[in-house]
Structure formats: structure tokens, C-alpha cells
Amino acid sequence: MSFGLAIRLKGARMQIFDKGKIYNFMGMRWVFFLISFVMFFGSIALLCTKGLNYGIDFAGGTLIQVRYHDKDAPIDLIRQRFATNEILKNASITEFGSAKEITIRYTSSSDSLGSSPGDVVAKMLQGTGEFEIRRVDIVGPKIGSELREKGIMAVVVSLVLILIYIGVRFEWRFALAAIFSEIHDVVIVMGAISLLSIDVNLDTLAAILTVLGYSLNDTIIIFDRIRERVKESKFIKLFEVINESVSLTLSRTIMTSVTTLLAVLTLFFYGGDMIHGFSIIMIIGILIGTMSSVFIAAPMLSWFRFSVESYRASVVAKELRKKEKEKLRAMYEKGTV
């Protein structure tokens, strides 16, 4: 399928694809169904076997922030010092904002280094340069478990609200297609998190919910255009209407995805180690969400027996009922009823 990409400026408006051309997206749906099938069940297999690597926010542990004044943080030397300590030898040491500042994370119990883990770390770092302990955060296992439960609940509640919203704004078949698409996106993103061993923390949860929002936005734009074209299009077959609708929204979809990806790529390359996990999840999620909106959510309407002719008939019947009510109201106001 050739799109013939060409950017043209018309006044202040940018148009990437030929507005009058209809691309056969649905002709490629089985290819993308196969790709999605492999990624979806591959992600489930990863989650069942490898699982997720919960960070301090969800598993409990300690975070210590250290800033060096006279030089960049000697991370390799710090790792050598920590290698002699049973608790800190597996600690995560990453830059935080600049090369002079680092965070030290470990998931052992809060009392594993005694009552003051900051003092223990400061003692072990003596001789590595002039530094200060700027922050010590401790999350207990119980609090971590509660945060994990609330995080799962946040995703579930968001999916339920999406189902209700689309069901009210469109109809139940659109709602189910959107929910399946969103679940598809979440599972694949979580599979990528497991595959890449990204720590699951509050930042990760924020990235997942943001991905849900972007994917839903794309899906609603396409569904809204499908609903509009079902009423007005010359086509009577569902897949032809979907091709027309997606083609009409293609420039907007591509521009939104590309501009968002550019911002996220900037975070990935210049945001530092602390935000790498968030940016990777966003990159994967935007790509998967864009694909699922076009090739998963839209074709699913046919699975739920959505019919263009039946929908048009229901719209006509609804308009007739509306006109009849308006006629009766007018007659009542005139006193003729």
C-alpha cells in the first residue's frame, strides 16, 4: 500500500496526504491482526513467566539522593564501595538531572541499614569527593503494596469510565471495540516493560495512563468520523466507510503522533536516566496506540455486527420520532391537542 507522502502548505494549513484519496487500510487488517496477536499473547507470556520488576514505589525500599560539589559523581567507584555491602551491592545508582547528582535505590527493608540509612551511605562514600545527602525517602512494604493496588485500580477504573463514555457518546459496539483496543495497548505496553526490565513505579503508571489517553483520543477521532460518514457516505459497506473515514483523519493522526514522538524522544535523549523508563513506555505506547486505533478498534466494529444500512435506518427513525415530538409540542402550545 503506497501512501505517496507529500507535504503541502495551503495557506496556514498543512496537508500531508491527498485529501480526496481513499487508502485501503482494511485490506491490510489481517497483517496487523497477526502482528497484534503475536505481540499481545507474547506479552501475556512474558508477564506470566518473567513478570514485572516493581520499583520502590510499589515494592517498598529506600531512595537516597546525593549531590557532589567539586566533580561529577564517581558512579563506578561508588559501585565498587557498595559491592562490599550485602544490602547495597544490588542497589541501583543513576544520574539525577546532572552528572553531579545521583540517586541510590535499594529494595531491602527500611531498617536493613539501621535507623539512618543516609548516615550509612555517607560513611561509605567518604573519600569519593565533597558531597551532601540531599534526600532520603523510605517506602515501607505495606505502603508499597497499597500503592500497587491503587495503581491497578486506577487502570481498571479508567477502562470502565472509557466504556461508559463511549457507550453514551456513540453506542455499545463502538464502546466494546474501544475497550478491546485499550486492553490490547495496555497488555502490549506492560509486556514491553517486562521485556526491557523497566522498574514499575508511579512514573510507569503515569506513562501507562497517558498512553491510554492518547490511544483513546485517536480512537474517538476515527469513530467520530466513521459515525459521520456512515450517515453521509456514498458507500454502504462498513470496511469502505472505515477506509474513507481513516483516510480523512490520516493527516491529523500522523501529525499528532509525530509531534508527540518528537517531544518524547527529546525526553529520552536529554531527560536523564530517571525519566528513561517513562519515555520508552511513551514511545512504544504511542506507536502501538496509533496502530490499534486504525487496525484494531475500527475493524472490530464488523465483529460486533455493526451494519451501515441498519445504522442509517435507526438514524432516520430517530429523526422521524424527533420531528413527531416537535410537531406534537407545537400543536400542544397552539392548543390544538
Where are the predicted features?
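A structural signal for conserved, well-ordered secondary-structure elements
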Residues: 2-337
